């Protein structure tokens, strides 16, 4: 499977084309739009989330509620585009451009992207570099999550840490409703109250906040990925997918950093055979060994830096005059940490769905289900 996205933050729409989805997968807007709404939620979001009410439009590859095997095309309209039609017009003219951005923002793609693509109006960089693009990736990832659910695989995400405030309540699959009901995607009500106070103060200060997200999947078969070549290792693919999301700066699988300072005898997960299957009493590896799923729960933590657009901007340089200036102000969030967990679950879900279709093949969902069931039986009997 593969996909491409296109579109700018204030362009008419975001578009995605997905190739390789098996036919006969039940699919409709009801499988996609709830994930788009989750992405827009969370305490600390900005005014853009009030303007946009994201919905996916399925344009090809789905008929009568099922995939056909043809490429799936979907679009998400940018409602804010009506305020930017002249500024974002593809037609020549209008120089000097309206709302040209020439004061590069530290921490953004602005300066480096401007040099790379020879733009002096840095809006030509930020429009595509914007995290608005993640709406398309959430739509794509939600389809992957739908495929995984049809194969008996379930995912979850929550905020482990926001601005140094940790969720102290250990993750439980029984707490998913509490996570979904929380505007900070944490089951820990006390931690959530502290997080809100920290966000409110940061907003008053014109500052932004980062955090750490945790994503989990259960029900994965043994053997997704490979140890044979570097580019087939699943942990490498997961890390790449996570770090490709705007503002993500670090990835941990299992208890990686905690394990780094321990002796091996206190790190690795002992293997047992009971009740007709292989099992581990601990999961320090986070469900991945040597680039392959081992049948245990997949546990991934991702560090998100604070958003780089500040209401009290940092010093910078104007790329036209080369004079010192303050960084440009753009509408932004105080924090998007809760939404980031949703995005990360979707991008990791895509990697897992891709790995499953690569390993088991098949043109249709029933074929994939049959082959996966056979692989599960073999692993249990091995």
Curated annotation (Swiss-Prot):
FMN binds at residues 128-130, 246-247, 290, 305-309, 331. Gene3D superfamilies: Chorismate synthase AroC. Its EC number is 4.2.3.5. GO terms for cellular component: cytosol. The keyword Transferase does not apply. The keyword NADP applies. PANTHER family: CHORISMATE SYNTHASE (PTHR21085:SF0). This is Chorismate synthase. It comes from Deinococcus radiodurans (strain ATCC 13939 / DSM 20539 / JCM 16871 / CCUG 27074 / LMG 4051 / NBRC 15346 / NCIMB 9279 / VKM B-1422 / R1).
């Amino acid at each position: 499977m593969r996909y491409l996205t296109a579109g700018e933050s204030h362009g008419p729409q975001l578009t995605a084309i997905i190739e390789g989805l098996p036919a006969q997968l039940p699919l409709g807007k009801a499988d996609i739009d709830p994930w788009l709404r989750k992405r827009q939620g969370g305490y600390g979001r900005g005014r853009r989330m009030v303007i946009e009410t994201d919905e996916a439009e399925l344009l090809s590859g789905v008929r009568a509620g099922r995939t056909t095997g043809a490429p799936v095309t979907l679009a998400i309209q940018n409602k804010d585009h009506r305020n930017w039609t002249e500024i974002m017009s593809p037609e020549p003219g209008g120089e000097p451009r309206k709302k040209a951005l020439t004061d590069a923002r530290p921490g953004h793609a602005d300066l480096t992207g401007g040099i790379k693509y020879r733009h002096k109006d840095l809006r030509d960089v930020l429009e595509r570099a914007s995290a608005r693009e993640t709406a398309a990736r959430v739509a794509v990832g939600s389809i992957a999550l739908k495929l995984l659910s049809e194969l008996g695989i379930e995912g979850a995400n929550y905020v482990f840490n926001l601005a140094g405030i940790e969720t102290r309540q250990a993750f439980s699959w029984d707490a998913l409703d509490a996570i979904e009901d929380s505007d900070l995607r944490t089951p820990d009500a006390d931690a959530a109250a502290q997080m809100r106070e920290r966000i409110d103060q940061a907003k008053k200060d014109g500052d932004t906040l980062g955090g750490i997200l945790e994503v989990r999947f259960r029900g994965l078969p043994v053997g997704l990925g490979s140890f044979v070549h570097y580019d087939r290792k699943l942990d490498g693919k997961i890390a790449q997918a996570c770090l490709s999301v705007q503002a993500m700066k670090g990835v941990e699988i299992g208890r990686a950093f905690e394990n780094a300072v321990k002796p091996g005898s206190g790190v690795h997960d002992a293997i047992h055979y009971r009740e007709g299957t292989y099992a581990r009493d601990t999961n320090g590896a986070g469900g991945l060994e040597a680039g392959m799923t081992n049948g245990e729960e997949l546990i991934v933590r991702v560090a998100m830096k604070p958003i780089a657009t500040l209401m009290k901007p940092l010093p910078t340089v104007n790329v036209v005059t080369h004079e010192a200036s303050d960084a440009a102000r753009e509408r932004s969030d105080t924090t998007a940490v809760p939404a980031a967990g949703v995005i990360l679950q979707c991008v990791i879900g895509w990697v897992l769905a891709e790995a499953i279709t690569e390993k088991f093949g098949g043109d249709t969902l029933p074929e994939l289900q049959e082959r996966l069931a056979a692989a599960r039986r073999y692993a249990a009997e091995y």
